[in-house]
Amino acid sequence: MTSNTEAFDYWIRNDFKQMNTALEELYFAREDRNDVTGLGDDIKTRLLEEGRSFIKTLLDEGNTDEGFDSQFDLLGNVGFYMAACRRHELTNPANEHKSPLVEASALAMQLGATLGMIPRFSSAHLETHNRADAGVYKSFTFLDDERIFINYNTRAVFAYIRAAEALLHTLPLGVSHSVTYDLLVAARDALRDVNRFNDELFDKLDTDRFFYCVRPYYKPHKVGLREYRGANAGDFAGINVIDLLLGLCRADDPYYSQLLVDKFLFMRPEDQLVLRDCMRRKSLLDSFLESLATGGETP
């Protein structure tokens, strides 16, 4: 990281979160919690201008080629800033021909094109690739319910990934291999972990706080001329690997293939490669059926 990148990252982890938290407390105390107008305008202006200043400095510096991980992290920080501006109605794609965040759009598009991803934050920035400093990772606010939401989403995502990796390891072995059974058990156990994490999230999350104070940061917004949907917790390859290898979905199904095409650029490049490879593989369900049809002894 350059010193300017580090300064922006420090701001995202501290002042940025403090300003968002202060605004959320103002909104939540209001009778109409959806109405964010006319509250905390001084905080909104500070957030807008401080973020713009950091980003303009990075644009002027022009040296964002610090390696993939550093670029990916910087894209997340720019994306967090743009998402917060959208949440606080400092931008609104319904009223704009293009994003008014000119500097942020320019930097996000430069980074997105270099990385092969959409030019906004993705779920990986908050989940699987969200580095903690002294135990504290990046988020939009300091609210407990955002922390709970990110914690359990991240746990569930990694459980899905464990299940997907176990299924992928069965492919070179074949369905009749004795160790394939062990891998299927590992996949089953990982999916049970997903259910457990979802149940715990349901029990612990304040749904009002989540709906009014966390969910709005995932709204669609424009980057340059184009509007991009918000990040989705399913924007990683593992969940689709499970669908495809278990035969629950098919890559040649028009509806499902459209879903895959739409999400590709929301995933990190290594996930894109895994999913592309999986789309051409025979499902385990088809392999089991073929083994039975040909008289396989232990499918």
Regions found by a protein language model. Give the residues of each.
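Surface-exposed peri-terminal alpha-helical interaction modules
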Residues: 1-299
